[in-house]
Amino acid sequence: GFITIDRTEALTAIDVNTGKYTGNNNLEQTVFKVNKEATTEIAKQLRLRDIGGIIIIDYIDMHEEENKKEIIELLAQSLKKDRTKSQILGFTKLNLLEMTRKNMCNNDDY
């Protein structure tokens, strides 16, 4: 899978895609695996690119609530290495994950 990061003045949108990854026959498990791998990379990219403010993550749709909870826990765990304070607000009704990350510098290169 791969992620796309779009920064605007209002917020940063991160889109998770499967790419050519097909995995096994269980679609939910394939989606969950791609989303888990993306979560670790997203936390890393937030630090490397010093992305702050409102962040919306558009994961590949997961239908099992337990998988969504695991993604939130993994993101929280991955962000613990980050000195910048983040707050994960959870999934919206549109299955978008809302979070905020404190802006540490004025970064105008959208």
State where each predicted segment sits.
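Conserved glycine-centered short motifs in functionally critical loops
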Residues: G1-Y110
